[in-house]
Amino acid sequence: YFYVRQAKRLDPPERVYDIAERVTDWLLRSGFRNVLVDGANEAAPWWKYPILEPGNVPRVIETVRGTTLDGRSLPVTVSTGGGKQIPTDAWLDAEDFTTPHGNGCQPNQLREKLRRVKETDAYKRRPRPIVVNEDSVFVENLEAALAEGCSWGFYCQGYGSDYQDRMDWKEHPRETEFDALSGFQTVPVNWEINTPIKRAFFERLKTITAGA
């Protein structure tokens, strides 16, 4: 629902709760059934926006879960930042599934991060799916997540962006020809599997899933 750049425009900040309730109600009434909610993307201390920082995450989650239609609610999480950050115990207790981001992690660091989540008391009390829904383009990180029994998210920014972690997307400008456009994040986007980086991921995924 929220990310730091747009959330900081909310005045007063408490509008977060009203928005979370209204959007959840709209989703419940939409008729779509397979909906998972990430209440705030990469909630982290660096937000400098207390209402969506780790200490308040449980309230955001409970706002979403407390919005129901005919007794039905939506499964909800809040994703962490990349690097070493994992959710607090209260955060883990509140959410239905866990979404640690793997941006910036080497494979061994990602495995360690996922193990740290699974070693928490909150996770042991109630094991749940762990979904690394944002990481990188590196297939070795996919392998690391799978080795820990977790799913993994291919995050392919595309050249011409200011974003950089293990991959430097500032290495050259945005491609000028549509057929050559890299990534799935930097606009304009070519949704085809048209670059070696994209092909490496989808070919590995095809092998894992025994796809046709």
Regions found by a protein language model. Give the residues of each.
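Substrate-binding cleft and catalytic face of glycoside hydrolase catalytic domains
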Residues: 1-14
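Alpha-helix initiation/capping motif
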Residues: 12, 138, 195-198
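Extracellular glycoside hydrolase catalytic/binding regions
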Residues: 18-24, 29, 34-193
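Charge-rich, solvent-exposed alpha-helical interaction surfaces
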Residues: 22, 201-208
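Eukaryote-biased activation of long, low-complexity terminal tails and linkers
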Residues: 191-195, 201-203
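Low-complexity, Pro/Thr/Ser/Gly/Ala-rich linker/spacer regions in secreted
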Residues: 210-212
